Structure formats: structure tokens, C-alpha cells
Amino acid sequence: MSTRKPHRLACRLKSVVASTVLLLAGAVAAPTTAHAAPANHYYIQIGGTGAAAEAPGCTTSFEAANRQLNGGIAIPVCYVASGGPFVGSHNEQPAPFAPSFGDSVNQGYWNAKAALENAYRADPTATFTIAGYSQGAWVGDLLLQTIANNGTEVPRDRVDGMLYSDPMQPGTGFWRLVPQGVLVPFVAYSPGTGPEVFPGVPVQRHCIKTDGVCDATSLNSFPGFLQQHPRYFREGEIIASTLARHGGSGTVWYPAA
């Protein structure tokens, strides 16, 4: 009987086995594909009047929120956060030599812009949220307008905004009552109202009904300011529960408590 066919079959089996071994060895030896780490996300945080703190904390307005950033990185902005000639969270304490709102906002704007651009230079793949509360929202509104107009080093598609109790809120904010450029003595020149939309930059405003800073629309706005305005930054309240959900647009309204 001929043994040629079994011999050929054995050779083929050896060839298949050898090829399989080589393929498996190659798969083991091949380096795994590297996965790029996700880009960092930074929160440029601009606090409200009377909330200034020593560096590096700079402001107390975002302390509760910073415990819930889900891996985000807080960059608090140091500035005087003053409202001379009165200071305090409700501007209830006379302070004739304290910087005015206008001077304080000007300092906050330039410090916030520098903080944003410095962070971008150090981490050019990062994304950013401009977060401002009260006077800090005024600062943030101005800075976001600059970003939307391509006036910073940071591409505007890397940035969004979260503004809490923005006095420049269009249609309802305090500054809609004073024409742009008009001086309110000892306070500031009116910045007027902010835009409804910041081109290329998603910005979401948050306002409690009757808070006279962002809802200056009725006689209830002054007592409402005293009652509602401190709610934003409290543990479990609006800033802490929403800041990490940045990226939206428009205005979110909350009922007065």
C-alpha cells in the first residue's frame, strides 16, 4: 500500500500547526495599542461679593461644588470681590475705602482671563468652564463675551459657561434697569445686559425667582435678594448640584423658597 497520502497529510498538519504557533506568538509579542488619556477639564471659578479668601482657595462660593466635580479641576480666581463703600455678603457693612464694584469687577476680569490663559498654556488639550456667582457672574459674563469674540488665546470651542445670579442677565437682571455706560455713583458704570447667546460658546444661566440680582422685575426683588441670594452656594443647593453638568444653554429658573 502506498504511504504517499498519509505522508502528505502529516506535512500539511505540521505546516498548519507551525503557522498557528507563529500567529499566536506574534499576537502575544505585539504591543497593545496605546489609548490617549482623556483631556482634563478645568473650572475657572469667580466668586461673589464678600466671598474672597486667601490663596489658593481665593473664594468660598464654590466650596460645596468642588466636592462634586467628578474629576474636574478647580481653578479659583483671586480678586477682592468687593462692593465698596459697603462690604459683606449683603453689602451691609460700611467700608468707605473698599474698592467699588466697578474696580473689583475690573480686577476680577483680568485675573480670570489670566487664569484661563495660563491653564491653557500649561495644558493645551484641556477644556474649560467659566463659572461665576453674583459679582463673579458679572465678571464671567464679560469674560465669556470676550471668549465668544475670539479675544483670548483659548479657542472658544474649548469653553462653556455656568453663571449663577448674573446681574447682566438679559430681560431680568439688575443692570437692565440702568442704560449701558451710565454711572451709578460709588458703584460702577453700567455694563448693560449680557447677550442671550454667546456665539460658539454654550452658556447656561441659573436664577432663583425674586432674587433681585438676576430677577429685578418686581417689588419682591429686594426682600427676595435677601432671602434667595445666599441659597446658590449652600451644600446640596444649586451650584453644587449643577456645576458638573455644564455645557447647556439658556436660563434655568428656580422657585423662590
List where the protein language model places each region.
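Gly/Ala-rich beta-loop-alpha elbow adjacent to hydrolase catalytic centers
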Residues: 130-145
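Surface cap/lid and interfacial helix-loop subdomains adjacent to catalytic sites
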Residues: 37-118, 146-257
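A short linear-motif detector with a strong N-terminal bias
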Residues: 14, 138-142, 182-185
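Alpha/beta-hydrolase fold nucleophile elbow
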Residues: 121-133
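Secretory targeting and sorting signals
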Residues: 1-36
